[in-house]
Regions:
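Short beta-strand->alpha-helix linker/helix-N-cap micro-motif
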Residues: 1-51, 62-66
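A short beta-strand motif characteristic of beta-propeller blades
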Residues: 150-155, 194-199, 238-243, 282-287, ...
Length: 344
């Protein structure tokens, strides 16, 4: 519930309340109490009574106020989060922002509420990158808010576009385009729109992935049908070869410390996961159980990986601690693919 002070349009408070409610419902972790079910409508701590929420089975309650700051349209939004079971206020804050950015302010508040309750960073102000193929001859590289709003078209082509990957600072996107007849990797600056092509010698260049420190891209370069893993330095624009094997090496993914890469290779006769140190180029096989292990990714702590695990025609999402040889399957279905993890 967000109240308003005199001189402020009432719909600002309503919009913030609705935006926060929508955000908190986005991932299915929370349920909201409708306004019609509430026993009271507090806009300050002095009006807040824990009993009114406890009897309704509410765990947390958020209240706030919207105040006008100046004639330029700036607003001061204050908010408080209460833990009903513990009967204490666990979060409060203020944000000054433009009335034209109510939605953005609501996302910041939602992030703080989410982190206070769950201990995880909120991701409501993050963005999506994706490719739209609206008809047979048009491909568009797009970005939008996490809820699909505020879509922007970055690039349009008559040829296929694929594999977008964000830079860590969210200022650039790397992707693959076939606009010149072959698979080619481009890096596009989101602010200026400028595009740089990675000049690799291979016939096919694919699977670009930014390192967490933003200094390099891991990518796959294919010479005469033999894909290998390469590093591309953002600073000096040089390519360094990491793998050199007659088997297929593909699907690179970085460790959180930017020192290692996990990749898929069929060098053993079936797709399995390997890890390589980007400095020493030492390689280590990570998976042995099952006849198919691919699409590996590190957990944020770097101690475990998750991937697609296949055995006897069933493909499931699995996890494995790097310190252990055992695999734990997370899903019970048979055609699972392409796991990824949220920014938090």
């Amino acid at each position: 519930l967000f109240g308003i002070e005199s001189g402020v349009e009432e719909n600002y408070g309503i919009q913030i309340s609705k935006d926060i409610e929508k955000n908190m419902l986005l991932f299915g972790e929370f349920e909201n109490l409708s306004v019609n079910e509430m026993l009271s409508y507090p806009s300050s701590e002095n009006d807040f009574y824990y009993r009114d929420w406890k009897v309704l089975g509410v765990d947390y309650s958020v209240i706030g106020n919207v105040n006008s700051v100046n004639a330029l349209g700036n607003l001061n939004i204050s908010y408080s989060l209460f833990n009903i079971n513990r009967r204490i206020k666990i979060l409060e804050g203020e944000i000054v922002g433009s009335e034209d950015n109510i939605e953005g302010i609501s996302k910041i508040i939602s992030n703080r509420i989410y982190e206070e309750i769950t201990g995880l960073k909120g991701i409501f102000d993050t963005k999506l990158a994706y490719v739209i193929n609206s008809d047979a001859d048009t491909y568009q590289m797009c970005i939008s808010d996490i809820d699909g709003k505020n879509e922007q078209i970055l690039f349009t082509s008559k040829a296929p576009i694929m594999s977008p990957d964000w830079s860590p600072d969210r200022k650039k996107i790397a992707y693959v385009s076939f606009e010149n007849g072959l698979a080619e990797i481009f890096i596009q600056d989101l602010l200026s729109g400028e595009r740089d092509s990675i000049q690799a010698l291979g016939m096919t260049n694919s699977a670009p992935v930014w390192s967490p420190d933003g200094k390099s891209l891991a990518l796959v370069v294919s010479f005469s049908g033999n894909p290998d893993i390469f590093l591309y330095s953002i600073r000096n624009k040089r390519l360094v070869r990491l793998t050199n094997h007659y088997g297929i090496d593909t699907e690179p993914s970085w460790s959180p410390d930017s020192k290692k890469i996990i990749f898929t290779s069929d060098r053993s006769g079936s797709p399995q996961l390997y890890e390589i140190n980007t400095k020493s180029k030492r390689k280590k096989r990570l998976t042995r159980d099952g006849n198919y292990n691919a699409r590996g990714r590190y957990f944020p702590d770097g101690k475990s990986i998750f991937f697609v695990h296949g055995n006897n025609g069933n493909f499931q999402i699995a996890i494995k601690k790097l310190s252990s040889r055992y695999i734990e399957t997370l899903t019970s279905t048979s055609l699972d693919e392409s796991p990824t993890i949220s920014p938090n």
